[in-house]
């Protein structure tokens, strides 16, 4: 009896443990998604107490700026009206450092800041040095000529004489460092003196002179602390709720984030929208496919073909016009009127007429498309590669002799890639806290549910076996009683009178 009672209590105990495991597993299945969501919301908002605040304040990911130049091979022939021939040079790679300063939390659930950036040349990653000479179109001459096309003959003559006096030509041979970070040009002083409204440029002239040791303006974005639906969205840039560069309300809108973090809990129907001060506009990327980066699930977002499409191909872009062929965006309105165009490298995703007009271009989606890999649960970028090209529209301008017989063409100057991938300690921390732990908890809840189900079977099986033993014992007892009754009945039948007579008769025989 002692052993049987002990076994019964063990079975009951295991059943109770199983019930608790099953209940805990069910509770975790029901509650865990909500808890994870709350933790994510708590740690992706812009708040000093959140896990992502330090990452937001000073990006720990190493960013690189890689620049590729389109060196002009036949400048003399271009002046005679022949097709341009270019040769790609580079990359010239710079390490980019960013950190936010003047961080001010406002009463309306927003935070204001400026982001300082500095660039440092990386010889070991580059194909060449900053002292390399490259032949490019002289933007001040050829760009200025297009800007002067509608001016009076007198102004054009003055410009021609000024260029000749200063020794300015249609194409220049300058170093990488000068082209990017600026050089002293007497023509800039000439323009500022005689045509002050043409180029509001002071000091050095360079394509990226405003990108180094500078900032991209004062951003005010929503923190998501009080209103999660607006997390990371830009409220104002330099105090503006919209820009005034373009010709439609929609194109002037400041939409999306500042381009560093997005709202969490993305789906394939989500899009990445951000405002780019360099492009003077908001841009939208669309979902391409799902993937994995260093064990972390990601969504890849890429640029749709409509990003730089002209108004005839994509009517909402009409506000960015006047336009030329589809696939390039005229940014002259935010670049002092200079005939500069923005596009994908090598005119990828643009009208083939553009790449066919210049020899040496080979658009390739694997080399020239841009992408951002985002962790969909948190909205934090894991890996990115943003590639853009700057081109100059050049042509012969009557009255300005330096332009010769140049045929109208959009001539690429350079393309650049801004890339970065999370790695090292930030990646390990991110993976452990936001990927590994939720996965472990997910496995635990199902293990508890399965274990609970198995343990609940123990008392059930014990009860069934106990009933079976009782049935066998009862069946054996009943059979024994029936045998005894049969023997007794047989004995009594032998002692009855009828039975005795029969026995005597048989004896006589």
UniProtKB/Swiss-Prot annotation:
The keyword Isomerase does not apply. It comes from the Eukaryota. The chain crosses the membrane at residues 12-32, 441-461. Keywords: Cell membrane, Disulfide bond, Glycoprotein, Membrane, Receptor, Transmembrane, Transmembrane helix. It comes from Cricetulus griseus. One of its GO terms (cellular component) is lysosome. Disulfide bonds join 251-384. This is Scavenger receptor class B member 1. Belongs to the CD36 family. The keyword Cell membrane applies. It is a multi-pass membrane protein. It is found in: Cell membrane; Membrane, Caveola. Pfam families: CD36 (PF01130). Residues 33-440 are extracellular. One of its GO terms (molecular function) is scavenger receptor activity. One of its GO terms (biological process) is cholesterol import. Residues 1-11, 462-509 are cytoplasmic. Glycans are attached at residues 102, 108, 173, 212, 227, 255, 310, 330, 383. The gene is SCARB1. N-glycosylated. Receptor for different ligands such as phospholipids, cholesterol ester, lipoproteins, phosphatidylserine and apoptotic cells. Receptor for HDL, mediating selective uptake of cholesteryl ether and HDL-dependent cholesterol efflux. Also facilitates the flux of free and esterified cholesterol between the cell surface and apoB-containing lipoproteins and modified lipoproteins, although less efficiently than HDL. May be involved in the phagocytosis of apoptotic cells, via its phosphatidylserine binding activity.
């Amino acid at each position: 009896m002692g052993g049987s009672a002990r076994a019964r209590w063990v079975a009951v105990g295991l059943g109770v443990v199983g019930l608790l495991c099953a209940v805990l597993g069910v509770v975790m299945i029901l509650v865990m998604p909500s808890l994870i969501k709350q933790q994510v919301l708590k740690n992706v908002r812009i708040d000093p107490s959140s896990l992502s605040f330090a990452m937001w304040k000073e990006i720990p990911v190493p960013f690189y700026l890689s620049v590729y130049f389109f060196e002009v091979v036949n400048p003399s022939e271009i002046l005679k009206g022949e097709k341009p021939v270019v040769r790609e040079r580079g990359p010239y790679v710079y390490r980019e450092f960013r950190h936010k300063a003047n961080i001010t939390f406002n009463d309306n659930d927003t935070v204001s800041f400026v982001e300082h950036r500095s660039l440092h040349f990386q010889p070991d990653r580059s194909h060449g040095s900053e002292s390399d000479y490259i032949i490019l179109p002289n933007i001040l001459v050829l760009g200025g000529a297009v800007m002067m096309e509608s001016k009076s003959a007198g102004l054009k003559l003055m410009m021609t004489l000024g260029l000749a006096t200063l020794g300015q030509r249609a194409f220049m041979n300058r170093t990488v460092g000068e082209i990017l970070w600026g050089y002293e040009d007497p023509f800039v002083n000439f323009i500022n003196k005689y045509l002050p409204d043409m180029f509001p440029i002071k000091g050095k002239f360079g394509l990226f002179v405003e990108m180094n040791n500078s900032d991209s303006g004062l951003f005010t974005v929503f923190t998501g602390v009080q209103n999660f639906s607006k997390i990371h969205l830009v409220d104002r840039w330099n105090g503006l709720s919209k820009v005034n560069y373009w010709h439609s309300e929609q194109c002037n809108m400041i939409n999306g984030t500042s381009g560093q973090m997005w709202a969490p809990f993305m789906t394939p129907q989500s899009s990445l929208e951000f405002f780019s001060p360099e492009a003077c506009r908001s841009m939208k990327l669309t979902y391409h496919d799902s993937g994995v980066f260093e064990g972390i699930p990601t969504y890849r977002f890429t640029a749709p073909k409509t990003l730089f499409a002209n108004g005839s191909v994509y009517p909402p872009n009409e506000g960015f016009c006047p336009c030329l062929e589809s696939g390039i965006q005229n940014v002259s309105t935010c670049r002092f009127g200079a005939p500069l165009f923005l596009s994908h490298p090598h005119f990828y995703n643009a009208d083939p007429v553009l790449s066919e007009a210049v020899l040496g271009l080979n658009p390739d989606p694997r080399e020239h498309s841009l992408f951002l890999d985002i962790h969909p649960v948190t909205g934090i970028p894991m890996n990115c590669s943003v590639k853009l090209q700057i081109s100059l529209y050049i042509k012969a301008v009557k009255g300005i002799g330096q332009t010769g017989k140049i045929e109208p063409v959009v001539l690429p100057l350079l393309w650049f890639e801004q890339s970065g991938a999370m790695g090292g300690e930030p990646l390990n921390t991110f993976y452990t806290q936001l990927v590994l732990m939720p996965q472990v908890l997910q496995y635990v809840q199902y293990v508890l549910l399965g274990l609970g189900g198995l343990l609940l079977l123990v008392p059930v099986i014990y009860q069934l076996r106990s009933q079976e033993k009782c049935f066998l014992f009862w069946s054996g007892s009943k059979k024994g009683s029936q045998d005894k009754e049969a023997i007794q009945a047989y004995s009594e039948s032998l002692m009855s009178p009828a039975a005795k007579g029969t026995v005597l008769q048989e004896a006589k025989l």
